[in-house]
Amino acid sequence: MERGEKTSPPELRSQPSSNSVALHGVERGELKTPDIQVALIVCNNPEAGVLKIAAANKIPALIIEKERFFQGDAYIKELKEKGIDFIVLAGFLWKIPVVLIKAFAGHIINIHPTLLPKYGGKGMYGHFVHEAVIKNHEKESGITIHFVDEVYDHGKIIFQATCPVLENDSAIQLAQRIAVLEHQHYPTVIEQLITDIDSL
């Protein structure tokens, strides 16, 4: 990215995620840095509600195919042509290919709805995470924002925030408190990371 250009993070999604709304804090001008924008929504589900959000906000969208994502060029050409230099995952369940990680080294982040390293890995997403937390009688849960590497939910932790797990909590109730943390912290962490990168 050349200095003076807008930093452009795409959002990769596959399942319903409250973070789509949170990320649009960038678009609504709620962040302190005006040069950050959601430049592209990348999705593997053509029926995903986030595509309607993208259309309403006039954000370009790219529907990706599994074979090309894993066995081809992982859409790197399209991302580069769009001027993408930072990738934000929000409910994207596919494992990120090594070729894409290398192409955007240190510029891909994810948010996980619990306190890693607990309750991470393949299959640990959405209500499955919250059910596991409650089943194991944890006293607190939270969110983890981390860099993406070749292993599910394994990259270097950037930020964590906690919330209590209350007696008689359901997975839905816990998820609601987690969503508050996601909306509160994800946009600002994204902003800080991009600002720090641009200042190097």
What are these regions (language model features)?
Residues 1-200:
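One-carbon transfer enzymes
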